[in-house]
C-alpha cells in the first residue's frame, strides 16, 4: 500500500 498526499508548497 503506497499512501501519499501531493502537496504544493
Curated annotation (Swiss-Prot):
The keyword Ion transport does not apply. GO terms for cellular component: extracellular region. It comes from Brotheas amazonicus. Keywords: Secreted. Expressed by the venom gland. It is found in: Secreted. This is Venom peptide 4. The lineage of its organism: Eukaryota, Metazoa, Ecdysozoa, Arthropoda, Chelicerata.
Amino acid at each position: 500500500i503506497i499512501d501519499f498526499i501531493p502537496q504544493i508548497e
